[in-house]
Amino acid sequence: MADDFGFFSSSESGAPEAAEEDPAAAFLAQQESEIAGIENDEGFGAPAGSQGGLAQPGPASGASEDMGATVNGDVFQEANGPADGYAAIAQADRLTQEPESIRKWREEQRKRLQELDAASKVMEQEWREKAKKDLEEWNQRQSEQVEKNKINNRIADKAFYQQPDADIIGYVASEEAFVKESKEETPGTEWEKVAQLCDFNPKSSKQCKDVSRLRSVLMSLKQTPLSR
C-alpha cells in the first residue's frame, strides 16, 4: 500500500523523493484531485448530465411536494373543517356579541319598561275606579236635578195658570181641553186629535217648506177617517 501511495504520489509529483511523504496526506490529495477531475473533466459530462437529469426531477418532486402539500392542505382543511367552522362561528359570535355596557343598558331599559308598564296598569285601574265613581255621582246629581226641575215646573205651571189673564190668553182652556180630550178614548176621533195639533193656516214664506199636500191629507183624514 505504501508503494501504491508512493506510486500515486510519484505520478502526481513526478519526483523520486515523494515516497518519503505522508501517505495519508498523499491519499487525501489524490482523492481531491480525482474529485476535481470528475467535476471538470469533459469526458464525464454525460454522466454529469445524466446525474443532472436525475437531479432534474427535483423541482418536479418539489412540485409534487407542493401538490402534496396542497392536497394535504385540502385534506387537512377538510379534516379540520368542523373545527374551522366552529372557530368561524365563535369568531362571528364574538364580533356580533354586544358589549357589556350595551348589554347592561338593555337590561336596565327592560326593567324600566316593566316598571312603567306595571305603574301604567295601576294608574289605569285607579282612573277606571275614579271615572266610575264620578259617573255614579253625576248620575245621582242629574237625577236630583231632574226631580228638582219637575217640581219647579209644576209650581211654575200652577202659578201661571192661576193668573187672572190666563183665560184671556187661552192657555188654561187649551191645556185643559187638550188634557181632557187626550184622556178620552173615542173610536174614530184619532185624526181629529192629530188635526188639533196642526196649524192649517196657510203661510206664504219662502223659508218654509210647502206642506199643503200634507195639510190636505190630514184634513181629509179628519173628515173621513179610515175604516177599520
Curated annotation (Swiss-Prot):
Assigned keywords, A-Z: Acetylation, Calcium, Coated pit, Cytoplasmic vesicle, Disulfide bond, Membrane, Phosphoprotein
Modified residues (N6-acetyllysine): 203
Record InterPro entries: Clathrin_L-chain (IPR000996)
Name of the protein this chain belongs to: Clathrin light chain B
Gene Ontology MF terms: clathrin heavy chain binding; structural molecule activity
Family (UniProt): Belongs to the clathrin light chain family.
Record PTM Phosphothreonine, positions in chain: 186
A family per Pfam: Clathrin_lg_ch
Domain of life where this protein originates: Eukaryota
Membrane association type: Peripheral membrane protein
Positions carrying Phosphoserine: 11, 13, 216
Predominant place of localization: membrane
GO CC, alphabetical: clathrin coat; clathrin coat of coated pit; clathrin coat of trans-Golgi network vesicle; clathrin vesicle coat; plasma membrane; synaptic vesicle membrane
Region (Disordered): 1-80
UniProt-annotated stretches for the region Involved in binding clathrin heavy chain: 92-154
Disulfide bonds listed in the record: 198-208
Quaternary structure (record): Clathrin coats are formed from molecules containing 3 heavy chains and 3 light chains. Interacts (via N-terminus) with HIP1. Interacts with HIP1R.
Sequence ranges of Low complexity compositional bias: 1-17
GO biological processes: clathrin-dependent endocytosis; intracellular protein transport
Location of the protein in the cell: Cytoplasmic vesicle membrane; Membrane, Coated pit
Modified residues (Blocked amino end (Met)): 1
Protein's job: Clathrin is the major protein of the polyhedral coat of coated pits and vesicles.
